[in-house]
């Protein structure tokens, strides 16, 4: 299956994305990760005001197949969570790159975004993982 990833997104090895929106960064999980999980039944996210540290676990997504930890692609202060994903996980399932975003962070160091993969590099990674 071929996936489309927005050009302005940056991706972590663990399949989370970060999208710069002004001074804030929107974080979610990629369509590839959602596809691998299957039907999502529960999403666990931290509280507004919490601090995320790049590479550390900040929540989880539970599907009928597995529970997967979510890892922060960048460090920063959590300023908003997507409440609708908590109450209706199918929003994450149906539109992971749009209405299914997870949180918004005020980045501690916006330069950390440059350490993440661009969409083309991530698409290549996904193609390799899909063929294994």
From Swiss-Prot:
Cofactor: binding details: Binds 1 lipoyl cofactor covalently.
InterPro entries, sorted: 2-oxoA_DH_lipoyl-BS, Biotin_lipoyl, GCV_H, GCV_H/Fam206, GCV_H_sub, Single_hybrid_motif
Lipoyl-binding domain boundaries: 24-106
CDD domains hit by this protein: GCS_H
Job of this protein: The glycine cleavage system catalyzes the degradation of glycine. The H protein shuttles the methylamine group of glycine from the P protein to the T protein.
Family that this chain belongs to: Belongs to the GcvH family.
Name by which UniProt lists this protein: Glycine cleavage system H protein
Gene name tied to this protein: gcvH
């Amino acid at each position: 299956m071929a996936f489309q990833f927005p050009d302005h997104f940056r991706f972590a090895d663990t399949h989370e994305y970060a999208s710069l929106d002004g001074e804030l960064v929107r974080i979610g999980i990629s369509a590839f990760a959602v596809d691998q999980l299957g039907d999502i039944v529960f999403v666990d996210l931290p509280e507004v005001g919490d601090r995320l540290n790049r590479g550390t676990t900040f929540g989880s997504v539970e599907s009928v197949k597995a529970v997967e930890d979510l890892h922060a692609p960048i460090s920063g202060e959590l300023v908003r969570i997507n409440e609708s994903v908590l109450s209706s996980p199918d929003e994450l399932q149906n539109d992971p790159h749009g209405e299914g975003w997870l949180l918004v962070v005020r980045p501690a160091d916006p330069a950390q975004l440059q350490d993440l993969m661009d969409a083309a590099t991530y698409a290549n990674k996904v193609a390799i993982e899909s063929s294994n």
